[in-house]
UniProtKB/Swiss-Prot annotation:
Entry's Gene Ontology molecular function annotations: ATP binding; UDP-N-acetylmuramate-L-alanine ligase activity
Gene this protein is translated from: murC
The protein's name: UDP-N-acetylmuramate--L-alanine ligase
Enzyme class: ligase
Pathway noted in the entry: Cell wall biogenesis; peptidoglycan biosynthesis
UniProt entry tagged with the keyword Chaperone: no
Upper lineage: Bacteria, Pseudomonadati, Spirochaetota, Spirochaetia, Spirochaetales
Length: 468
């Protein structure tokens, strides 16, 4: 279904607290549309974003009635966490002949309106999207941006409604949602087997990425991370001759190589694209890759559009050095009595490994206390041995019951305890609390000055920071 955005006034979002859906709602709200929505009563970081944007929403998604609301809507946008006609509000919309589109379908419609840049990958797409939006915005290019988390440099928002024809969006591979998107430029950060409840094997996931590459508009630009072997394999399978492919990375085989990488205080310093001694405020090397991807995309955009930025090098270096971070991405929540409190969204074994090892390397003399909540039964079961291996790296580990997705109907208790017992065999400093709040007093008794405490996962254990 094609959307005529000029004819829309009122838009209603079902599942408005989802990260992407919230960003889209804020984006369209800033563009002047009347936006409302509904979701569950559980609290997420998106509650604050919606409140900051003065967007009204209801918290009774399973009982909510559009008819009782007494307002007419031109479009219903729903989260993929729900079936298209799986809720009363969606059934009512169908009965009332109100157009119903998924979040990813609306994102796809927007991509056809603009010069669009899509960012995809199993890991790092949120951060890369934020970096790209930040660069374009700070350099005066007035972009439109939709990213899956709140960005401090966006004023703690997850969207920018600019006045240019540039549209930058994080796009997701789950259920092949990104195939709705039609980019002029595509950035791929990496590929890892993930979303095992949908992709039956790695080959199915790889095929989805190849399909997405074929969505590039004529003479489109593809940017890949050549440090990722899976992306190099995909590169060899691309048949379209009109696509312009550029690679970046820390290895010699990349078209554009990152060099002179050193850690200095709170910064990773590196050289890239002729810019020497760029200082990026981050504790993780993979953010150097993410920033470099964004910087290369910016450079290619400027070249292909005949644009230039006054004092480009100094401006980019200032942006990198002053980068303030993203919600739930190695976020420093607070420092209290000599303890650093952090929060991170890592929920796949590779993300957990890279984040934990990066933190341990950066904070060499600190004791790392990890509070982890596994996310989805299917992911935990599929990567069970990998989880056991990577989680045992923490100096002290606190585990909780698996946080199920809306699509799952399993009892998580047995698998959660099994994970705990298997890790305990490797790391005796492993503890289990089924419910998050039950661990508060125990964690308080553990923490001493000099520790680093980090909550990790896609569940709700981040609430611990409110009690510590």
């Amino acid at each position: 279904m094609k959307v005529d955005f000029d004819s829309l006034n009122n838009i209603f979002f079902v599942g408005i607290k989802g990260s992407g859906v919230c960003s889209l709602a804020c984006f369209l709200n800033s563009k002047g549309y009347f936006v409302e929505g509904v979701d569950v009563s559980d609290k997420f970081h998106t509650d604050k974003i919606l409140s900051n944007n003065k967007i009204s929403y209801y918290e009774n998604i399973y009982e909510f009635s559009l008819k009782e609301l007494g307002r007419s809507f031109d479009l219903i946008v729903y989260s993929s966490a729900y079936d298209k006609y799986g809720l009363p509000a969606l059934l009512e919309a169908k009965e009332l002949n109100i157009p119903i589109l998924s979040y990813s379908e609306v994102l796809g419609e927007l991509s056809r309106k603009y010069y669009s840049v899509g960012i995809a990958g199993s890991h790092g797409k949120t951060t890369t999207t934020a970096f790209l939006g930040l660069l374009f915005n700070k350099l005066g290019l007035n972009p439109n941006v939709i990213v899956g988390s709140s960005v401090k440099d966006f004023g703690d928002n997850s969207a920018i409604a600019g006045i240019s024809n540039i549209f930058i969006a994080e796009t997701c591979e789950y259920k092949k949602h990104f195939l709705h998107f039609s980019p002029n430029m595509l950035i791929l950060t990496n590929i890892d087997y993930e979303h095992v409840d949908f992709f039956e094997n790695y080959e199915a996931l790889e095929d989805a990425f190849l399909q997405y590459i074929n969505n590039l508009k004529k003479n489109g630009i593809l940017i890949i991370n050549s440090d990722d072997n899976n992306l190099l394999k995909i590169k060899r399978q691309i048949n379209r001759k009109d696509i312009n492919i550029f690679s970046f990375g820390s290895k010699d085989l990349s078209n554009f190589q990152i060099s002179n990488i050193v850690v200095k205080n709170e910064y990773f310093c590196f050289s890239f694209l002729g810019l020497c001694n760029v200082e990026l405020r981050t504790v993780l090397f993979h953010n150097v890759l993410n920033f470099s991807a964004a910087l290369l995309a910016l450079n290619l955009f400027l070249e292909s559009n005949g644009k230039s930025i006054f004092d480009f090098e100094e401006a980019v270096k200032k942006i990198a050095k002053n980068y303030s971070g993203i919600k739930r991405r190695v976020e420093v929540v607070k420092e209290k009595k000599g303890v650093i409190y952090m929060d991170d969204y890592a929920h796949h074994p590779r993300e957990i490994r890279d984040t934990l090892l990066g933190i341990k390397d950066f904070y060499k003399n600190k004791r790392i206390i990890l509070d982890f909540m596994p996310h989805t039964f299917t992911r935990t079961k599929e990567f069970f041995n990998d989880f056991v291996e990577v989680l045992s790296v923490a100096d002290i580990l606190i585990l909780h019951n698996i946080y199920l997705s809306n699509r799952e109907n399993f009892n998580p208790d047995e698998l959660s305890v099994k994970l705990f017992l298997n890790i305990k065999k490797i790391n005796k400093n492993t503890y289990f609390f089924k419910d998050v709040k039950d661990s508060v007093e125990f964690i308080k008794s553990l923490l001493i000055s000099g520790d680093l405490f980090i909550t990790m996962g896609a569940g709700n254990n981040f609430i611990l920071h409110d009690f510590l």
